């Protein structure tokens, strides 16, 4: 056993304008090549577009979208006796949020549109309503876990 202490889990910092951790998690996932100011610009433009589209609080739309996309359970490949099984595992809240953000960004990148802010705002609004590619991805993951429920004892 290691003599070193266990690493403390870092809490996500909040962004400067909205003081929201989810916004900061989004910024850190959208970030490419260290261009954080560009990532902030994209997020803030998307939030502004959400405000224009829905005429409600954009942060509540963001929260609702992430809550809707967050999976409760996922499958993990586990090799048992020469064959690989997809074993369903429960997901914690932090990991679930991280997955939800990754899926939302992936779905928004695939969307047709002028720029990333427009694509992201459209995907977030759709996810808050309960439609869109990110929601489909969550449902697909839940279906996979349900189909492989017989292998749950391999954990």
Curated annotation (Swiss-Prot):
Name the record gives this protein: Small ribosomal subunit protein uS7c
Annotated localization: Plastid, Chloroplast
Entry keyword set: Chloroplast, Plastid, Ribonucleoprotein, Ribosomal protein, RNA-binding, rRNA-binding
Family per similarity comment: Belongs to the universal ribosomal protein uS7 family.
Subunit structure: Part of the 30S ribosomal subunit.
InterPro entries referenced in this protein's UniProt entry, alphabetically: Ribosomal_uS7, Ribosomal_uS7_bac/org-type, Ribosomal_uS7_CS, Ribosomal_uS7_dom, Ribosomal_uS7_dom_sf
Coarse class of the protein's main subcellular location: plastid
GO CC list: chloroplast; small ribosomal subunit
Record's function text: One of the primary rRNA binding proteins, it binds directly to 16S rRNA where it nucleates assembly of the head domain of the 30S subunit.
CDD domains membership: uS7_Chloroplast
Domain of life: Eukaryota
GO term, biological process aspect, one: translation
Molecular-function GO terms, alphabetical: rRNA binding; structural constituent of ribosome
Record NCBIfam families: rpsG_bact
PROSITE patterns: RIBOSOMAL_S7 (PS00052)
Regions that span the bilayer: none
